Structure formats: structure tokens, C-alpha cells
Amino acid sequence: MDLHSLALILRTAALSPIPDERKVSEQQLNQLEHTPQHLVRLLQIAVDGNCDMAVRQIASIQFKNLIAKNWSPEDCGPAVRQQQIFESDKELVRDNILVYVTQVPTLLRSQLGESLKTIIYADYPEQWPRLLDWVKYNLQNQQIYGALFVLRILSRKYEFKSDEERTPVSRIVEETFPQLLTIFNGLIQIPNPSLEIAELMKLICKIFWSSIYLELPRQLFDLNVFNAWMVLFLSVSERPVPVEGQPMDPELRKSWGWWKVKKWTVHILNRLYSRFGDPKLQSPENKPFAQMFQKNYAGRILEGHLNFLNTIRVGGYLPDRVINLLLQYLSNSISKNSMYKLLLPRLDVLLFEIVFPLMCFNDNDQKLWEEDPHEYVRKGYNIIEDLYSPRTASMDFVNELVRKRGKENLPKFVKFVVEIFLSYEKATVEEKPYRQKDGAMLAVGALCDKLKQTDPYKSQLELMLVQHIFPDFNSPVGHLRAKAAWVAGQYAHINFSDQNNFRKALHSVVSGLRDPDLPVRVDSVFALRSFVEACKDLNEIRPILPQLLDEFFKLMNEVENEDLVFTLETIVDKFGEEMAPFAFGLCQNLAAAFWRCLNTSEANDDSDDMGALAAVGCLRAISTILESVSSLPQLFVEIEPTILPIMQKMLTTDGQEVFEEVLEIASYMTFYSPSISLDIWSLWPLMVEALVDWGIDFFPNILVPMDNFISRGTAHFLTCKEPDYQQSLYNVLSTLMTDRNIEDSEIESAPKLIEVVFQNCKGQVDQWVEPYLRLTVDRLQRAETSYVKSLLIQVVANMLYYNPGLTLGVLHNTGLASKVFDLWFQMLQQKRKSGLPANFKREHDKKVCCLGLTSLLALPGGQFPDEALQRVFRATLDLLVAYKNQLAEAAKETEVDYEEEMNGLQSSDDDYDDDGSDGEMDDTEEGDEAQSVKLQKLAAQAKAFHYDDDDDDDSDDDFSDEDEFQSPIDEVDAFVFFVDAIRVMQASDAQRFQNLNQSLDFTYQAIANGIAQHAELRRVEIEKEKQKKLAAASTPVTAL
């Protein structure tokens, strides 16, 4: 197709007012996607200056989307891998995109830049070795912007890569940094530089940042080279930003080119200090460099940062992000004695005249509060905003100061805060320092953990709250009412000597849900969560629960905030089954809120949009509600129509961001409903499609509802032909298990699903034994991890248990029977250094193997010769002993856990070791080291809880018997099953039984007798358990 015709189709697809025309053009574009030269033609249209800009933009978007989807198909699902771009087209695109990416208008550059990023990330260095030469050539020939633009993408590729993946960085630095240093030096010398110069300097800074983010390239350990860079960064950092040309608009001003250069320079200096400038954190070979940095640069940077911060003290301007970064550096300096000594003479001015004012309510806050309260709430609860916020950095600085240098700083800071509280109390209404009071309250809330642990403050907290915080629940100033709620929430868990104070605070927070100001209502919800968690007498809340939920949903209609949902989850958790009368209404409201959040998120198309986070929160809350009413299956029938549309939409590509949460809901619906409805069965094809196309990372999550479909809807699974679920399952498992590009770790759930089929459909899926067995054995020959080998062997065991004769026959037909059994027995015998089994570690694994091997014992001699019988018999005995020992060990651990739990219940909730120490730094710098040792001890304790020993190289088994799952073999006792199989053999072929008995040495005869005795004990126990259940079922329930 020629360029003109393609341009017409693009125009029609995007701009035609007639829907049918748009649809036809979109279909044409879909058909053209994988034709030769199509990608190249899109690029030609995008860069054609004679073409209409709207069409160029559409072409650039199509170009970007095609490259994102198809350039590197190995990153996608099996279905997408078939749609590869022709190599000749790739070559043409690589050759041309570099030329045009910096020449096109900014509107198009972002699209082409994204495309270039995808290509570089996929192709450099293997498929695009000439790229770095292109960069060097253009740097030398003064095509600086294009070269820096590409080099920035290239360096960004390796920013977060681990050591072994960072090898190309060394070459990039070696071949380009000398030129970059020369260019940077030249740019700094230019008098009255333009914004274009700022853009070039910013790009160089970002390239440097990406190159040093995780590791310092070896070239920079050359002190002459490093010093040359530092001279430039310090020069840029210390010189004032040009006044002329700064925009007046605050949003434009903070993004102005020269402020961006300043931000990146400070960013780099901070990173060098925090990552490479602390000798205690470095390896022996890097310690001299860190000592040099500490001696030559750390103090100078500190002085520069303090001088820079003084700008805001005298009324000057600094962007929020720059203030945040400057304070981060100062916070990192507090624990270093040499740095703290430099900081000390200016500390009071910094703390009381710069940091504290940043914590106070300000003009910008007031403007937002009045003009856009929704935006005020969004900024206050946005994690990304927190990263850039001067207020957050100020709170972090104060926290670090009192944590590391508390003895000299906590008393004076508390005194300062109390003075503000007292002056506020004494002042007339007109003169009250409302904003300073807000900052003081923020400080008290931020220091909550420290004050709760430190004498004499911890004994005075209740009095402080009653005197200085709780009165502001009724303040005429909205932001103080909001702050009162927030601070009250921070201290909700303290021991109130007078429960009336807790009660009053709780009711004040609940009243705050009806406040006229939106931010007060939101902060009240946030605080309520803490009060609900801390509440020992739920009767305080129970009577107002319906009204509380009403206020919740009114607020959810107004604002999208995941903290609202967290509080709701806390209430549901706390009240459990008592939420049953509200469950249906809650799910309806949450579903409605979810759709609203989703629509907002799609409309904003914003990656850090609060709507998207709140949407996830709604789904999580629905899961929490379903869990809380899991003992009431009929409720699931009522709730299903409300949440089914969510699952149907979000189990497609539309729901990739919430796929895990939706699958959790699907798991509850398929497990707890009285039966699985046909509507819920409509989710099966969506899961299958996702699994094949793009969702293999979610296979463990998909496994759960698919297991439920098969185990709880077995009849429908077996009989339905439209769609044919059996065939559908085989198709997807076959596609995944035969794909050589899929790693072992990605298909661990496949053998588990095969197990589900054969355990739940016993005697009804004979036709699937051969296909699944061939699939399993084929993958077994290629499997690399022992965990996947174990899972595949268990598929063989499950099939033997399902039908030993049929399975053994198919195995013989493959010609691999001996190979499979040899591997099985070899894996059974393998031990770890600790002496524990290396494979089949869980009780479930051992039991499956026991049942599979035992099933062979009853086969006639013609199918299973004596020599094989003896080998299997001995292996089964060993396995039964190991299984018995593991069951006994688990029972012992359960008993110990129960005793510890009972002991824990008898001890006070408040019995924690609290000596009031505040972890002070002394004259040495041991504080961080002590903390490090403590963390190492905690890490060691945590590691001790893992099932696998330290000396176990094969750590790919991430399952334990604590993963509670139900299985049809739960009702089968492996010991009884074994003894019954031997009796069948004895009855049907006495001679064969006698030969087997005579082949056993004394040890195995003793084991066999022990297992037989244990089996009889188990029969008695099983019978007793049955009688107990029958008695319990027949006992009438007393009405409450």
C-alpha cells in the first residue's frame, strides 16, 4: 500500500465522524499490521513535514503501539510471539529513527522517543552494535542534542541492572564520558546561556545519574576523572539560578529548564554521598574512595545545601523537589559525627526557622483547601507527592534528628512545640497562630513512635491529647479539625487511663465524617481505622455501624482514595460475620465506586492516578467482605450479579493492573458459592485466553479458580461441550508446557492443574491419560529445576493412582518407562546437606507418591514383573516411613504452636520491653553499626522460619504444608491404602506375595510390619473420627 492511501486510512480511523467508516478503517489497519514495510511506512508518514500534523500524530501513535507490542515478542505470551516484525523492517527502522527522533516537533518526539526506547532496550548491544558508534560520531560532530537524547535512553536501560547485567555500562562510560565532560565544561563557560543549554546540561546530568545509580563505573574511581566531574557539579550546584526568564506561573516555574538542571545536580551529589560516600557501607576495595569523598566533598556539599536552603528563610524561591532533596542530604548527615559537627552551629536556625515553617499550613494549602479540596486530599494522600514534598522531607529530618541525636534535640523541640500550644491557647481568636499550631500538631503526630517510647513524654501523652489536640475537633478552622483527627488516629493505640477520653475521641472522629469540609471527612476516615483497630469494646461502634457505613459510601461517592477502603476493610475484619446483613449493600457500593474510579482513571490516563489505586482498594475490600461471610454461601448467590460484570471486564486485557485482585474474587466466588453458576463459568474462557496471550505471570493466581471449577463443578466440566472445558484445558496446558521459551518457574502451576483433573475425575477421563502423560514426560525430559521435576513426577503418580494399568501401558508405549522410574527413585533418594529429603518435601508430595507407587502393587505379574515389584515395594516402604515421620513432626509443631498461642493470650498486650531508651548516638559512630547488627539478627531469625535449609542449593520449592488446600485424596489414608493393596495381592496371587516377602531383608520386613500395625491404628482412629462427625451432625443446634 502506498503512503497516500495509508495516510487516508489513518485519517479516517481517527478523525471520521461516521462510526462505520472508523470501524472499517480500524479493521484495515489491523489487517496491515503484519504486512512487510507497514511499520516503515508509518514512520515515513510520522516524519513527513508535508503531511497533516493530525495524521502524523496518528501514525506516530500507531508506530509506537506496534513496536511496543511486537518488537520483542519473547517478552509476551505465546500467541503474540507469532506476530513478529520482519527483520528487514527492523533494520530499516533502526537506521532511520535515529535521524528523525530529534528533528520532529515535540508533540511527535515523545511517541518516537518511546519507540526508540523499546528498540534500544530490546536490541542493544546484540542486534544494534553500531548504536554507540553513532552516538560518539554525533557528539564529535556537534549533533549534540540527538546524541545525548539517545545516550540518555541507552544509559537508562542499565540504571537498575544488577552487576552481571551492567557490563555494557563500562564501555558506554569509557567511550562517551570523556566527550561528555568536555561538552559539559564548555556549556558551563557560556555567558548568559539559553534554555537550550540548560536542556543539554540536564541530559548530561541524567546520563551521569543513570550510569552511577547502582554502581560507580571503574573509570570514575580514577580520582582525576572523578574530581573533574565533581568540580562541574559543585559549580552548577553553588551558582545561583538565572533570575531572568523565570516563569511567573508556579507550575511552569518548577519545571523551568534551569531549575531542572539544579534538581539533577543536587540529586547526583546526594546519590554519590548516600551510595558511595559512607566508608562503613563500602567493601574494603571501595573504602578509600568513600574516605576521600567524605574528606573532600561531603562537608562542602553540606555547606552548599545549607546556604541554598537559607534562600527560603529570607523569602526566596526554591522548587518543592529541590527543597526535598536538600533536606534528604541533611537527614543522611545526622548520624555521621563529622557531618553533624558541621551541621550543629546552624542546627537551631535550620530546625526552627526553615524546617518547622515547612511543616506548617501555608498559603498554597489554604488556596487548595478553599478552591479545590479534592486536589488537597489527593496531594495529601499521594505516595508520589510524598516523595517530592518539602513537608514530608521536613518530617523525616525531625524524625531522624530525634532518633539519632535525641538527647540534645528532642527536649528542645518538644519545648518549642509546647510553647506554640500554650501561646495558641492564650491568644485571642483574632491572634491565634493557627498555622503554627497546625505545624506543631503535625510534629506531634510525626514523632508519635518516639514519644510513645521515651520518658517522661510517654506518661504525658493522654494529657497532651486532652489539653491540646482534642479541643481542635471543634475548631472554627477546618485544617485544625482535620489535623486533630489525624493526630488522634496516630495515638489511638496508647493506653488511655480514662476510657472516656478514648470514647470521646472516637465519637469526635465519627462526627468528623459529617464535617462540612471534605479534607476533614477524609482525615477522620483515616483516623477511624486506627480507632477501630484499637477498640477493645466493639459495643462502642456496633450501635452506629449502619450510619457509619452510610457516611463511608457518601464519602466514597465524593472522593477516590484507597485509605477510605483500608478503613472499610479494617471494620469488616473486626466485625467478621456480623457484617453479613451489610455484605450485599457493601458490595453494591464498592462495585459502584470501582466503576467510578475506573472511569476516572481511564479519563485521566495518569500512571499515578489515585483513582487507579482506589479501584484496586475497592476490589480488595470486596475480597475482604467475601472472606468475612464465607460461612454463609447463600450470600454469594445474592452478591454474584453485582460483581460478575467486574470480573467479566477485568479478566481481559483491560484488567491487567488489577488481575490478581479480580482472580482472588473469582476464587472466593467459585469456592464458597453453593454451586458454580453458568454465569461464573463464563469466566473460564477469559482466564484461558489471558493465560495464553499475556497472563502467564498470573498462572499461580489463575490456578486457584480453575481448580475450584474442576473440583466443585466436576459434572459440568466433564459433560459440557459448548465450550468443551476438557479440550480447552488440554489446549492451554499443551501450549504452555511445549513452549521452549517458557521457563520452568512459569509452568509450575500446569502439573498442579493436571493433578486436579485426575484426582477429581477418577474413572471418568481415561481418554486424557495418554495425551497428558505424553505432555508430562516430554516436559520432564527438558525440565531443569528439581521442583518442576518433582511436580511432573507427581503427575505420573496421580495417573498411576487414577488407573495404574492404563498409565503403565502408556508409559511403556512412550519407551520411557524405565527412564521415568529411574529418575523418580533417584529423586526419592536424594538428600540435602542437612539430611532432609531434597525432593517431594511436603506431606502432600510424599502422599501422592505413596498412592501412585502403591497402586502398582496390586497389578498382575503380566503387567508388572516381580523385579519391578520388589523395587517399588521397597521405595514405597521408605517413603511411608518418611511420610509418617513428617506427619508426627507436624503434629508436634502444631501442639507447640497451640501452647505458645495460649501463653500469648495469657500475657498482657502491653508487655513489651520499653526502657525508654531512644537509641542515642554517642561520640562514636556505632549507632548505624549497632542497627545493622540488629537487622542482621532479625534477618537471621526470619530466615530460620523458612522450610529450606541454608545449605540447600535447590530453593525453588516455595510451597509448604501451611499452604492449606483441599484435595480428594485427603480422605484416603496412605497407610491403610498400602496395606489394602498388599492384601489384594496376597488374595489374588499368593505365590507372588510370598516371593515378594522372601525378597525382603530383615530391615524391610520390620518396616513392613511396623507400617501394617500403624495402618490398623489408623483404621481405628478413622472410625472414631467418623463416629464423632456423625454424632455432631445429629446433635440439634440450640437456638440463641
UniProtKB/Swiss-Prot annotation:
<feature type="compositionally biased region" description="Acidic residues">
    <location>
        <begin position="896"/>
        <end position="929"/>
    </location>
</feature>
<comment type="function">
    <text>Functions probably in nuclear protein import, either by acting as autonomous nuclear transport receptor or as an adapter-like protein in association with other importin subunits. Involved in the regulation of the abscisic acid (ABA)-mediated pathway in response to cold or salt stress. Involved in UV-B responses by regulating accumulation of UV-absorbing pigments through mediation of MYB4 nuclear transport. Involved in trichome initiation by controlling GL1, GL2, GL3 and TTG1 transcription and may affect an upstream regulator of GL3 and disrupt complex function.</text>
</comment>
<comment type="subunit">
    <text>Interacts with MYB4.</text>
</comment>
<keyword id="KW-0346">Stress response</keyword>
<dbReference type="GO" id="GO:0031267">
    <property type="term" value="F:small GTPase binding"/>
</dbReference>
<comment type="similarity">
    <text>Belongs to the importin beta family.</text>
</comment>
<dbReference type="GO" id="GO:0070922">
    <property type="term" value="P:RISC complex assembly"/>
</dbReference>
<feature type="modified residue" description="N-acetylmethionine">
    <location>
        <position position="1"/>
    </location>
</feature>
<keyword id="KW-0539">Nucleus</keyword>
<dbReference type="GO" id="GO:0006606">
    <property type="term" value="P:protein import into nucleus"/>
</dbReference>
<dbReference type="InterPro" id="IPR016024">
    <property type="entry name" value="ARM-type_fold"/>
</dbReference>
<feature type="domain" description="Importin N-terminal">
    <location>
        <begin position="25"/>
        <end position="103"/>
    </location>
</feature>
<dbReference type="InterPro" id="IPR013713">
    <property type="entry name" value="XPO2_central"/>
</dbReference>
<feature type="region of interest" description="Disordered">
    <location>
        <begin position="893"/>
        <end position="931"/>
    </location>
</feature>
<dbReference type="InterPro" id="IPR011989">
    <property type="entry name" value="ARM-like"/>
</dbReference>
<dbReference type="InterPro" id="IPR001494">
    <property type="entry name" value="Importin-beta_N"/>
</dbReference>
<keyword id="KW-0007">Acetylation</keyword>
<dbReference type="Pfam" id="PF08506">
    <property type="entry name" value="Cse1"/>
</dbReference>
<keyword id="KW-0963">Cytoplasm</keyword>
<protein>
    <recommendedName>
        <fullName>Importin beta-like SAD2</fullName>
    </recommendedName>
</protein>
<keyword id="KW-0813">Transport</keyword>
<keyword id="KW-0653">Protein transport</keyword>
<dbReference type="GO" id="GO:0005634">
    <property type="term" value="C:nucleus"/>
</dbReference>
<dbReference type="GO" id="GO:0005737">
    <property type="term" value="C:cytoplasm"/>
</dbReference>
<dbReference type="Pfam" id="PF03810">
    <property type="entry name" value="IBN_N"/>
</dbReference>
